């Protein structure tokens, strides 16, 4: 496990976006030196009430209808970023280590999508991945970074450096009673023992034009990814705003440790996203890949829903 001090990189790169006419297709876009792909790793289902906190079901169900168990369908979408000789993943999905009972509880579905098959579509194997940026260590974000080989737990991406914030890693190893079910030992121990975990201290420009931004409302030390050049910005906001239905500021998950912190973080980041026309990638929305927002008469609203 390696700790790294903060540093700066002021390189700028010329770039442009490539948009598709049809929504909900997983294609690609280019920002500067980065070719960016959005990959599906699987689907799962979570309680709609928990996903929207204090917001009444009569409101959230208009956007996200629930099943007979009050669950809404969730995606687990990750970024694949190709840059020079680097092949970078942002998050890794839930993985395939769940016992049958938990698979049933969460309605895990890998029939349509999985991380490995999504990588294969880009002619990549796990051994090709050089870097894995983990926004945080909840099971649906980190589980795919490890796998079972018989009874042995090992890294899915054995040659990759895995990046986690120091404050979050410490929290993940000693979580609260409220969130400890989200941190599974089988997801953390292989990383801890691998020698391929790099602990980061705060916000930084990890690669030229690729910035890590901190959020502390959903969990302590969550790192979001912003990729930008002189013209365009992509914002992978992880669980700060998991779906398009969470654009209204008070629409905050019941899972969040510090909802008032989430409220202020959403206000700050979404205001900037609105002013600067960011493309916001939605990790958990099963129907919408990315959005741009605008200021409506009373609140921030979705201006357009986009495919990448």
Describe every region a protein language model picked out:
Residues 41-43, 92-95, 137, 167-168, ...:
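Active-site metal-binding loops of divalent metal-dependent hydrolases
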Residues 88-90, 133, 162, 234-236, ...:
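Residue-level marker for buried hydrophobic side chains located in beta-strands
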Residues 1-27:
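Intrinsic disorder/low-complexity segments
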Residues 106-117, 230-308:
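Cap/insert and terminal regions of metallo-dependent hydrolase folds
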Residues 31-35, 42-122, 224-239:
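Conserved beta-strand hairpin/beta-sheet module of binuclear metal-dependent hydrolase folds
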């Amino acid at each position: 496990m390696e700790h790294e001090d903060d540093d700066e990189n002021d390189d700028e790169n010329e770039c442009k976006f490539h948009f598709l006419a049809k929504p909900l297709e997983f294609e690609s876009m280019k920002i500067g030196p980065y070719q960016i792909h959005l990959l599906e790793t699987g689907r799962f289902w979570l309680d709609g009430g928990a996903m929207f906190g204090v917001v009444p079901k009569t409101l959230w169900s208009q956007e996200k209808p629930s099943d007979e168990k009050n669950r809404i369908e969730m995606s687990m979408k990750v970024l694949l970023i190709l840059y020079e000789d680097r092949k970078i993943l942002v998050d890794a999905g839930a993985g395939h280590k769940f016992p049958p009972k938990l698979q049933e509880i969460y309605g895990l579905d890998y029939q349509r999508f999985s991380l490995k098959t999504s990588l294969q579509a880009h002619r990549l194997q796990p051994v090709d991945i050089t870097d894995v940026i983990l926004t945080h260590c909840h099971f649906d974000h980190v589980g795919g970074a490890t796998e079972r080989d018989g009874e042995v737990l090992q890294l899915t991406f054995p040659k990759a450096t895995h990046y986690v914030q120091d404050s979050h890693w410490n929290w993940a190893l000693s979580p609260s009673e409220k969130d400890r079910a989200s941190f599974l030992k089988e997801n953390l121990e292989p990383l801890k023992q691998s020698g391929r975990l790099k602990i980061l201290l705060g916000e930084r420009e990890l690669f030229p034009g690729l910035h890590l931004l901190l959020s502390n409302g959903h969990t302590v030390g969550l790192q979001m990814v912003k990729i930008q050049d002189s013209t365009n910005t992509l914002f992978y906001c992880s669980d700060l705003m998991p779906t398009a239905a969470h654009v209204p500021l008070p629409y905050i998950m019941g899972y969040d440790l510090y909802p008032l912190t989430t409220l202020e973080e959403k206000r700050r980041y979404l205001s900037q996203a609105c002013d600067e026309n960011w493309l916001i990638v939605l990790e958990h929305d099963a129907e919408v890949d990315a959005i741009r927002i605008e200021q409506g008469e009373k609140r921030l609203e979705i201006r357009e829903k986009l495919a990448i």
